[in-house]
């Protein structure tokens, strides 16, 4: 019975991937889209709820930690509601709606500023295809491919901070204009502050703002295109899974363009409990993401936006009654490289629950 279950059961996977929600780079690429690696079952419908909470409170300048003198932080919660319909035994369609909530403390105009915002993010439509679904005795292997479009449904007004009028033409001449920024109008202060941040001209990292409009925006204002694939393999009680996603991004609100980004994850583990209608597995998961520099109007490069991070942590998955599937994971950063001054993550927690009708 167990061999039959292994052959036909729901693949114990991390409900991960990955959809891209504008935010801090570590938050952009590692979100859920509540995707399962189960083969589609014709006319089946799945409803999923997934949550990722990320705590960002470590400031890094060009990959090196600096003192967080003013206790800047960003707490980011992304809850994704997902519905998936299996058109056939190899193809399914999915809609993912993120609800984003962020709370932060940062430095603006030499003053401590606290803020928060919440709302619907950028909705994603995905199509999944399973070209390979191999099963032979104790061995199971499954290849999944997906692609889709991310719609500009989220509020992107915070990106206006990044596109203050006139800053494109003045960036090259603004070095050393730090003193002038304190005596100008509110708009000019915002302009000079932006220029200093994105050109690294603030010489006291401990007082530099590490949280910007691109970190806290709920949406991008752009039409983006996620593409990816996942491979799942199971032999007896051992599990291996790897996933990768690349997101192509276009120009969005305020002429702001988020950099294309890569996200990947690989996990290995073993069943702790395995029966016909229930299973529990423990896995070790290594994941990461990479994105380059965001750009503005005319291709101007924003120097505090590149990010390359690697995370590791445990993950527990469970299946009940062949209908309910859940996952709980915890990630710690083991390597983070960033450009200029940014707030970076100290930990994140992931949880998801899926029901198949």
Q: PLM features: what roles do these ranges have?
A:
Residues 45-53, 95-99, 145-151, 233, ...:
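Transmembrane beta-barrel strands of outer-membrane/channel proteins
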Residues 51, 85, 97, 129-131, ...:
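Residue-level signature of outer-membrane beta-barrel architecture
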Residues 36-44, 90, 132-142, 158, ...:
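Short loop/turn motifs that connect adjacent beta-strands in outer-membrane beta-barrel proteins
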């Amino acid at each position: 019975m167990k061999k039959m279950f292994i052959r036909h059961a729901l693949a114990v996977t991390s409900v991960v991937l990955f959809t891209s929600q504008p935010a801090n780079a570590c938050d952009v690429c590692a979100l859920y889209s509540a995707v399962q690696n189960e083969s589609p079952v014709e006319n089946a419908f799945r409803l999923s709820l997934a949550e990722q909470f990320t705590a960002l409170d470590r400031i890094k300048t060009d990959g090196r930690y600096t003192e967080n003198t003013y206790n800047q932080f960003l707490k980011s919660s992304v809850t994704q509601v997902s519905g998936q319909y299996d058109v056939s035994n190899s193809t399914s369609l999915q809609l993912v709606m993120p609800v984003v909530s962020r709370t932060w403390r940062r430095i603006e105009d030499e003053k401590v500023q606290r803020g928060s915002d919440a709302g619907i993010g950028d909705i994603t439509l995905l199509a999944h295809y399973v070209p390979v679904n191999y099963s032979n005795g104790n061995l199971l292997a499954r290849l999944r491919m997906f692609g889709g479009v991310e719609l500009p449904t989220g509020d992107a007004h915070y990106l206006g901070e990044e596109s203050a009028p006139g800053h494109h033409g003045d960036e090259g001449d603004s070095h050393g204009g730090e003193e002038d920024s304190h005596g100008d109008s509110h708009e000019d202060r915002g302009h000079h502050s932006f220029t200093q941040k994105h050109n690294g001209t603030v010489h006291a990292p401990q007082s530099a703002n590490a949280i910007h409009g691109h970190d806290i925006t709920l949406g991008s204002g752009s039409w983006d295109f996620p593409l990816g694939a996942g491979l799942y393999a199971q032999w007896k009680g051992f599990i291996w899974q790897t996933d990768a996603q690349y997101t192509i991004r276009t120009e969005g609100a305020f002429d702001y363009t988020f950099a294309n980004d890569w996200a990947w994850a690989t996990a290995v583990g073993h069943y702790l409990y395995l029966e016909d209608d229930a299973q529990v597995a423990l896995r070790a998961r290594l994941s990461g993401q990479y994105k380059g520099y965001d750009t503005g109007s005319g291709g101007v490069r924003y120097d505090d936006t590149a990010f390359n991070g690697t995370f590791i942590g445990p993950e527990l998955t469970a299946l009940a009654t062949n209908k309910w599937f859940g996952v709980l994971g915890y990630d710690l950063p083991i390597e983070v490289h960033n450009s200029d001054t940014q707030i970076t993550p100290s930990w994140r927690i992931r949880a998801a629950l899926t029901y198949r009708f």
